[in-house]
Swiss-Prot record:
Native organism: Homo sapiens
Main location: mitochondrion
Sequence ranges of the ANK repeats: 2-31, 40-70, 82-111, 115-145, 149-178, 182-211, 214-243, 534-576, 580-609
GO CC aspect terms: Cul2-RING ubiquitin ligase complex; cytoplasm; cytosol; mitochondrion; ubiquitin ligase complex
Region ranges (Disordered): 240-278
Cited InterPro entries: Ankyrin_rpt (IPR002110), Ankyrin_rpt-contain_sf (IPR036770), TPR-like_helical_dom_sf (IPR011990)
Family to which this protein belongs: Belongs to the fem-1 family.
Protein name as annotated: Protein fem-1 homolog A
Post-translational modification: Phosphorylated; highly phosphorylated in myoblasts and myotubes. Phosphorylation at Ser-108 promotes PGE2-EP4-mediated inhibition of inflammation. Dephosphorylated by protein phosphatase 2A (PP2A).
């Protein structure tokens, strides 16, 4: 263990005497080096603050000159926080004495992490009320600094269910209707977490029922997450609304004075909210803050029922909520009709939404139809662009796959993938997950068929080819973006999945016309000139063993001679270069694949091409490999190649004296 690591470990473990022994008598330069970042990215001061070692913190700052602002990496709840200052770490862990000490020694109260999280947000996240009070009350920490997602301290307090912190922030003037980058408010966070008491608190401070970027109100957010208590509270009939036929109160639309809707109408520092939800501001009832229309209540109950089907797996509970929704639709003799679907969907087995009480009651004998109803309801209310819509379609497909109904699974997954590609940005994580699921499913089914023979489930060319075509389309869409996707891990993964689908296509029978279609699609991919990590082309990736690791479950095995041949047949350049000037031949040599090397050479790859380190592919072959002795590089070297290497070796100037295509040939060597 080196001295730097020993200092870090002593600070982490709170061993002050050992730390003093290691650091005493050191020069300023040595102290700066020893109290700086270690290999993991943290500093001794940061880790001491993280674990609350006050004496170590003060020693490092006062005696060793450690910077109270130096950020680093620190671990919390299984996550690595980058660029965290010591004050952030102490606040997140709730060490009030360390927080006081660091602030007395000049730490900035609003200094943020790499994701723009402040010490105040860190304290709010884990519910450290005393730290929050100290940061705000004694040092005027900014309540409104949001993280990179636009999520504020009030929002995270609501989401985590820290009622007293939320109350305190509101008393200090936190903006109750502030919106995040995705348009959600603190009310949405309460609804998603099921924090009814905090939701009542916010409504008492004039929180508005806004729609977020997906068109979701807090009421719908509660339905999606299955928080029945929030839904029941928000849809209860409101006093003072107009009466409908039959003498029952009908919930009406919100009537709110805009002048009082921008948070708590109190000066900063004045008490904003009452001491309990039963004592609202200005004598107003909480109910008057959140009247809900009949249509909104119906949709909330229908969506809640869908959540009971798919998330809670409670079909009887779902029926109960759907019955209430149906009663509301027919309330007072004025029927609220459902919109007619533009067309029936094969993936849903051509199901229609029920429209009468009789149709609804008939569902109790058909659980599968109930599950289709849940998918139909969710798509109607949330729309195709909401992540939950496609997520639960895929979830239902996975359930079918688990029971061996792969055909039904594939239909649902294809429908979800079409929905994602039509509504989400290219290479969104959800779309990438869909492609990977397809590859893993196809691999499993093809292995199952091989094991069971004709009894296995049939996966045909059309299934694989359909997904491959969509994968190539996704790459084309990504390359049309204004930013360059080549360095994106998601883009590399998309290319790898396409190669795995090509690998699997070898295992299904193809007619000549289908083979032609496959080659056309691969040609489209190559024409895009996509590049993955380190500038890898698809041909580089096909000869690299790391391409095998694409998900949790095995799909194809790489390097793959079959995939290499398909790519070469479709026009892949065997002399293409990555960022280190490696050709696919170099990568094949690094992976000890002489058979693939021979295929590349036969396709015109230059055996004597050198990479950025002036190594040929032959020189990269494992010396212990038997095939190295059988490969004769000079059998593939032309006189032209030797001349090019001689020019390079002797540093003979050639640029401007020969044609440009010859210049490129010399640079290859």
């Amino acid at each position: 263990m080196d001295l730097r690591t020993a200092v870090y470990n002593a600070a982490r473990d709170g061993k002050l005497q050992l730390l003093q022994k290691l650091l005493s008598g050191r020069s300023r330069e040595e102290l700066d080096e020893l109290t700086g970042e270690v290999a993991g990215g943290g500093t001794p001061l940061l880790i001491a603050a993280r674990y609350g070692h006050l004496d170590v913190v003060e020693y490092l700052v006062d005696r060793c000159g450690a910077s109270v602002e130096a950020g680093g990496s620190v671990h919390f709840d299984g996550e690595t926080i980058e660029g965290a200052p010591p004050l952030w770490a102490a606040s997140a862990a709730g060490h009030l004495d360390v927080v006081r000490s660091l602030l007395r020694r000049g730490a900035s109260v609003n200094r943020t992490t790499r994701t723009n999280s402040t010490p105040l947000r860190a304290a709010c996240f884990d519910g450290h009320l005393e730290v929050v009070r100290y940061l705000v009350g004694e040092h005027q920490a900014d309540l409104e600094v949001a993280n990179r997602h636009g999520h504020t301290c009030l929002m995270i307090s609501c989401y985590k269910g820290h009622r007293e912190i939320a109350r305190y922030l509101l008393e200090q003037g936190a903006q109750v209707n502030r919106r995040s980058a995705k348009g959600n408010t603190a009310l949405h966070d309460c609804a998603e977490s099921g924090s009814l008491e905090i939701l009542q608190l916010l409504l008492g401070c004039k929180a508005r029922m806004e729609r977020d970027g997906y068109g979701m109100t807090p009421l719908l957010a509660a339905s999606v997450t299955g928080h029945t208590n929030i839904v029941e509270y928000l849809i209860q009939e409101q006093p003072g609304q107009e009466q409908v036929a039959g003498g029952e109160a009908q919930p009406g639309l919100p009537q709110e004075d805009p002048s009082t809707s921008q948070g708590c109408a109190q000066p900063q520092g004045a008490p904003c909210c009452s001491s309990s939800p039963e004592e609202p501001l200005n004598g107003e009832s909480y109910e008057s803050c959140c009247p809900t229309s009949r249509e909104a209540a119906v949709e909330a109950l229908e969506l809640l029922g869908a959540t009971y089907v798919d998330k809670k797996r409670d079909l009887l509970g779902a029926l109960k909520h759907w019955r209430r929704a149906m009663e509301l639709r027919h309330q007072g003799g004025e029927y609220l009709p459902k919109p007619e679907p533009p067309q029936l969907v094969l993936a849903y087995d051509y199901s229609r939404e029920v429209n009468t009480t009789e149709e609804l009651e008939a569902l109790i004998t058909d659980p599968d139809e109930m599950r289709m109803q849940a998918l139909l309801i969710r798509e109607r209310i949330l729309g195709p662009s909401h992540p939950d819509t496609s997520y639960y379609i895929r979830y239902r497909g996975a359930v079918y796959a688990d029971s061996g109904n792969f055909e039904r699974c594939i239909r649902l997954w294809k429908y979800a993938l079409d929905m994602q590609q039509s509504n989400l940005e290219p290479l969104s994580p959800m779309t990438a997950s869909s492609f990977l699921s397809f590859a893993e499913l196809f691999s499993y089914v093809l292995q199952d068929r091989a094991a069971k023979g004709s009894l296995g489930t049939q996966i045909g060319f059309a299934d694989l080819m359909g997904v491959l075509t969509k994968g190539v389309r996704e790459v084309e869409r990504a390359l049309q973006l204004p930013r360059e996707p080549g360095d994106s891990a998601q883009f590399t993964k998309a290319l790898a999945i396409i190669l795995h689908l090509l690998y699997l296509l070898e295992k299904v029978e193809c007619t000549p016309s289908q083979e032609h279609l496959k080659h056309q699609t691969v040609y489209r991919l190559l024409k895009c000139a996509p590049r993955g990590k380190n500038g890898f082309t698809p041909l580089h990736m096909a000869v690299d063993k790391d391409t095998t690791n694409v998900g949790r479950y095995p799909v194809g095995r790489f390097p793959s001679l079959h995939v290499v041949k398909v790519l070469l047949d479709c026009g892949a350049d065997p002399d293409s270069r990555d960022f280190d000037n490696n050709t696919p031949l170099h990568i094949a040599a690094q992976n000890n694949c002489p058979a693939i090397m021979n295929a590349l050479i036969e396709a015109g790859a230059h055996m004597d091409a050198t990479n950025a380190f002036k190594k040929t592919a032959y020189e990269l072959l494992d010396e212990k490999l038997l095939a190295r002795g059988t490969m004769q590089p000079f059998n593939y070297v032309t006189l032209q190649c030797l001349a090019a290497r001689a020019l390079d070796k002797n540093k003979i100037p050639y640029k401007g004296f020969i044609p440009e295509d010859l210049e490129a040939f010399i640079e290859l060597h």
